[in-house]
């Protein structure tokens, strides 16, 4: 009979339906849900539909696309939500509330993604305003606070952390992130995760200051839509002139969390972004990336594209092995 230590080491290498984010694995898969970029009523199912997928560890709910004031957008999933009476841009979503709890019961790590390309508020005029906004976000999506009257889009459901996917300059974003981090650290109980989704160009203009100031658990880099993406990878050589994972590895070692992990972000289908590559091409990309201690798996945009692209998920899983 194998020892418990040996068994634990083996399980750390094997994706499981009962496992969310695994810091010791190089086979994590994170997928964004909520924007239905495939753009058909049938291409985005309710959140819980995807939580039976044993290959997916992390689901990023996209997006809280406004913060001051708060705004949500979940594409067709929002059709089953109800606007709050005093803020028609903020949705109350009992179905998503129930589904978050179902997904967490299935072992999935559920993050709320902040920003997105439709975020246009530009941030905050002062550090204090950014900190107040972070307190509000924590009250809305963290543990229910006794006596609080804040609107909670997901009711009593509590997310497992926050993803920062800002695509444009956001004033005082680092102060916002630091305050939100302090709230999660002080909460006790379960671990709350922080991730960010910069574009592959380094440094990233939108979240660069944030990730240089606030410790992240992982960075899910958008290696698409740019020459530094996976489509620029050259097989058979350790010197990459375009695909710049090495640059991000170097940054990670001096970041606020020197143990931060990196996910290679890819389009989940040909319509998800420029620079889509097939699963067979990804094998060489991932084999190269596995040579770095920071590598922890893949991120895909988005769930609707993934489920339309028959067989691609299996190809990604196999490429990560």
Curated annotation (Swiss-Prot):
Record's family?
Belongs to the glycosyl hydrolase 18 family. Chitinase class III subfamily.
Keyword field contains Nucleotide-binding = no
What job does this protein perform? Secreted chitinase involved in the degradation of chitin, a component of the cell walls of fungi and exoskeletal elements of some animals (including worms and arthropods). Plays a morphogenetic role during apical growth, cell division and differentiation (cell wall morphogenesis). May be involved in the degradation and further assimilation of phytopathogenic fungi, namely mycoparasitism, the major mechanism accounting for the antagonistic activity against phytopathogenic fungi displayed by Trichoderma.
Indicate yes or no for the key word Signal: yes
- Subcellular location, record wording: Secreted
Q: Which residues form the GH18 domain?
A: 27-321
What reaction does this enzyme carry out catalytically? Random endo-hydrolysis of N-acetyl-beta-D-glucosaminide (1->4)-beta-linkages in chitin and chitodextrins
What UniProt keywords apply to this chain's record, in alphabetical order? Carbohydrate metabolism, Chitin degradation, Chitin-binding, Glycosidase, Hydrolase, Polysaccharide degradation, Secreted, Signal, Virulence
Broad class of enzyme this protein falls into: hydrolase
Use of this protein:
The antagonistic activity of Trichoderma harzianum is used for the control of several soil borne plant pathogenic fungi.
Q: How does activity fare over a range of temperatures?
A: Optimum temperature is 40-45 degrees Celsius.
One Pfam short name? Glyco_hydro_18
A GO BP entry is: chitin catabolic process
**What are the catalytic residues?**
167 (proton donor)
Record GO cellular component, one term:
extracellular region
Q: What molecular function terms (GO) are annotated for this protein?
A: chitin binding; endochitinase activity
| The name this protein goes by in its record | Endochitinase 33
Signal peptide span per the entry? 1-19
Which EC number(s) are documented for this chain?
A: 3.2.1.14
State the oligomer form and interacting partners. Answer: Monomer.
The protein's induction, as recorded, is: Specifically induced by chitin and strongly repressed by glucose.
Q: What InterPro entries does its record include?
A: Cts1-like, Glyco_hydro18_cat, Glyco_hydro_18_chit_AS, Glycoside_hydrolase_SF, Glycosyl_Hydrlase18_Chitinase
Species = Trichoderma harzianum (Hypocrea lixii)
